[in-house]
Curated annotation (Swiss-Prot):
InterPro entries: Pept_tRNA_hydro, Pept_tRNA_hydro_CS, Pept_tRNA_hydro_sf. PROSITE patterns: PEPT_TRNA_HYDROL_1, PEPT_TRNA_HYDROL_2. The record marks D87 as: Stabilizes the basic form of H active site to accept a proton. The keyword Transmembrane does not apply. One of its GO terms (cellular component) is cytoplasm. It catalyses: an N-acyl-L-alpha-aminoacyl-tRNA + H2O = an N-acyl-L-amino acid + a tRNA + H(+). The gene is pth. It comes from Campylobacter jejuni subsp. jejuni serotype O:2 (strain ATCC 700819 / NCTC 11168). It is found in: Cytoplasm. Pfam families: Pept_tRNA_hydro (PF01195). This is Peptidyl-tRNA hydrolase. The active site is at H19 (proton acceptor). TRNA binds at Y14, Y62, N64, N108. GO terms for molecular function: peptidyl-tRNA hydrolase activity; tRNA binding. Belongs to the PTH family.
Amino acid sequence: MILVVGLGNIGVEYENTRHNVGFMLIDLLLKESNFTNLTNSKFKGELFKIGSSLLLLKPSTYMNNSGLSVKAVNDFYKCERMIVIHDDIDINLGALRFKKGGSSGGHNGLKSIDTLCGNDYERVRIGVGKGENVISHVLGKFKSEEEITLSKVLEHAKKALLELIENDDLSAISSKYSLKA
């Protein structure tokens, strides 16, 4: 079983914010897939299954406690692989990077996952840039001119993620799909 986690915050006030790009990519995948909804309160998030071996998770624990949801799903399904999609303020909007393991880079959602599940998982890092005030920036909505760039990056990230799930070769995917901005 492969678990793909899109990080974000629940609630209308957080829709279309920079911190929710993980949710956005999961939503894009669901829009184009036949899936089974496995959402259950024990998973602390929205959980979907595509085919026989792919789980998509949107934690409903808010960003800083994402690890609670990830651990609940991982413990129940004993997933062999985990891929986490998240915003990254250290790369510009329009950039896309891939990584396995390493530090959280100050990202509280990743810190929570690392604490409860370890850090040996693949990451899809979607650049959102860094504003003057980090918290206001990541919780802020995208400007209309940024939405065009975001849409292109999400579509590109979707293709990369689908290929990564299929081929399990992070290095090749990184070479083929990384974007600079």
